[in-house]
């Protein structure tokens, strides 16, 4: 499991909103943002370069961010939505969702693997099928991503959703119990097994014939 790394960024409060104000902010190197949740909404702006740097660091919906809001101090949030201009690669607007301790939220958690599956060394094909899951949990138990060790997976083995080791507060929102990772037999391995089985059958037939 990967604990949540806290990213920090300063927010300048704004009392004026609207298209003209947003354009003015962007021309000055700022990006308009909204902070929602906890019954209070705050409009603000953040430095575009600092925001892009944070976004390109690989933040997810489950990444904890600490906003230093002008006049309000530190507030822990998650990214709810990032809007970009379709014609240019620039962030247009960001909505942050304020963390309320003990109040469950729904977010997406990435699944990563570590190690080399044992079966992949003996002719098996390793497959990572599910890379992300939706989870309902309290903010205190959120992880940026879930890491599973696949070292002991042999040919024919798999890891299902129900086998994941997760915090007890997690409710994984998925239908059934699908396979997350597996090691399957390759065509070459299946062909080798068929050839071996055919050879064994031929040997058995010869042995029986010799006894007559």
Curated annotation (Swiss-Prot):
Q: Which GO terms describe its molecular function?
A: 5S rRNA binding; structural constituent of ribosome
Q: Which PANTHER family match?
A: RIBOSOMAL PROTEIN L25/GLN-TRNA SYNTHETASE, ANTI-CODON-BINDING DOMAIN-CONTAINING PROTEIN, RIBOSOMAL PROTEIN L25_GLN-TRNA SYNTHETASE, ANTI-CODON-BINDING DOMAIN-CONTAINING PROTEIN
Query: Coiled-coil segments, which residues?
Result: none
Q: Which Pfam families match?
A: Ribosomal_L25p, Ribosomal_TL5_C
Question: What are the alphabetically sorted keywords of the record?
Answer: Ribonucleoprotein, Ribosomal protein, RNA-binding, rRNA-binding
One biological-process term from Gene Ontology? translation
Q: Which GO terms describe its cellular component?
A: cytosolic large ribosomal subunit
The UniProt family comment states: Belongs to the bacterial ribosomal protein bL25 family. CTC subfamily.
Q: How does it assemble?
A: Part of the 50S ribosomal subunit; part of the 5S rRNA/L5/L18/L25 subcomplex. Contacts the 5S rRNA. Binds to the 5S rRNA independently of L5 and L18.
Query: What does this gene product do?
Result: This is one of the proteins that binds to the 5S RNA in the ribosome where it forms part of the central protuberance.
Ribosomal protein found in the keyword field: yes
Output this protein's name: Large ribosomal subunit protein bL25
Q: What gene is this protein a product of? A: rplY
Q: Record's superkingdom? A: Bacteria
């Amino acid at each position: 499991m990967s604990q949540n790394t806290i990213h920090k960024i300063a927010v300048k409060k704004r009392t004026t909103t609207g298209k003209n104000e947003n354009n003015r902010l962007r021309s000055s190197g700022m990006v308009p943002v909204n902070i929602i949740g906890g019954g209070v909404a705050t409009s603000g702006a953040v430095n575009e370069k600092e925001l892009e740097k944070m976004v390109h660091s690989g933040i997810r919906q489950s990444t904890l961010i600490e906003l230093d809001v002008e006049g309000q101090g530190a507030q822990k949030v998650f990214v709810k939505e990032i809007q970009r201009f379709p014609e240019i690669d620039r962030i247009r607007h960001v909505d942050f969702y304020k963390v309320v301790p003990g109040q469950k939220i729904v977010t997406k958690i990435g699944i990563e693997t570590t190690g080399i599956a044992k079966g992949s060394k003996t002719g098996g094909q390793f497959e990572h099928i599910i890379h992300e899951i939706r989870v309902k949990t309290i903010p205190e138990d959120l992880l940026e991503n879930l890491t599973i060790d696949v070292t002991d997976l042999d040919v024919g083995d798999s890891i299902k959703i129900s086998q994941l080791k997760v915090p007890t507060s997690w409710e994984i929102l998925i239908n059934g119990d699908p396979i997350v990772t597996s090691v399957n037999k390759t065509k070459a391995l299946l062909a080798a097994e068929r050839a071996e089985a055919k050879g064994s059958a031929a040997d058995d037939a010869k042995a029986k014939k010799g006894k007559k």
